[in-house]
Amino acid sequence: MGLSFAKLFSRLFAKKEMRILMVGLDAAGKTTILYKLKLGEIVTTIPTIGFNVETVEYKNISFTVWDVGGQDKIRPLWRHYFQNTQGLIFVVDSNDRDRVVEARDELHRMLNEDELRDAVLLVFANKQDLPNAMNAAEITDKLGLHSLRQRHWYIQSTCATSGEGLYEGLDWLSNNIAGKA
């Protein structure tokens, strides 16, 4: 009896670790999101050539977040980060109407990869503070998210600079990855 209670207690309260891959087109706000979550502040960023990796502690969960550069020349490298990924954060610049089709194509190409078949998908519809930003429903439509019948996904409106929506997204991720474990 005592042993099973101890197991239950440790399962409920032990720190959980989750491997998260964050990708999206260049200038979507991935690095700003990563450091807003990690440091709680806005940092000056330059285009990511390669990757940034940080551990973000939130609600007894340790998220290892891999932020991979989004320039078209380095997108083929994304697949090298797929292994053991439990959650995929796809960041979209909600104000970039000219490249939303490109974002959709990259997302669907990635989701067809076998190594990501079990990963849950969180879409951050970023830059919601900009006046012409597409809302989450429009982004859902433009990315073709409703066609992802076999995928557990969620879209969260965010503003990386203020932090708005970021923790709601992490809550969804943690609940849905933990539910699959």
Swiss-Prot record:
Transmembrane domains' residue ranges: none
Keyword check for Transmembrane: no
Compartments reported by the entry: Golgi apparatus
Major place of residence: Golgi
InterPro entries in the cross-refs: Arf1-5-like, P-loop_NTPase, Small_GTP-bd, Small_GTPase_ARF, Small_GTPase_ARF/SAR
UniProt entry keywords in alphabetical sequence: ER-Golgi transport, Golgi apparatus, GTP-binding, Lipoprotein, Myristate, Nucleotide-binding, Protein transport, Transport
Lipidation (N-myristoyl glycine): G2
GO cellular component, one term: Golgi apparatus
GO molecular function: GTP binding; GTPase activity; mRNA binding; phospholipase activator activity
Regulation of protein activity: Activated by AGD10.
Binding-site list for GTP: 24-31, 67-71, 126-129
Gene Ontology BP, a term: protein transport
Function, as annotated: GTP-binding protein involved in protein trafficking; may modulate vesicle budding and uncoating within the Golgi apparatus.
Family assignment from sequence similarity: Belongs to the small GTPase superfamily. Arf family.
Protein name: ADP-ribosylation factor 2-B
Organism: Arabidopsis thaliana
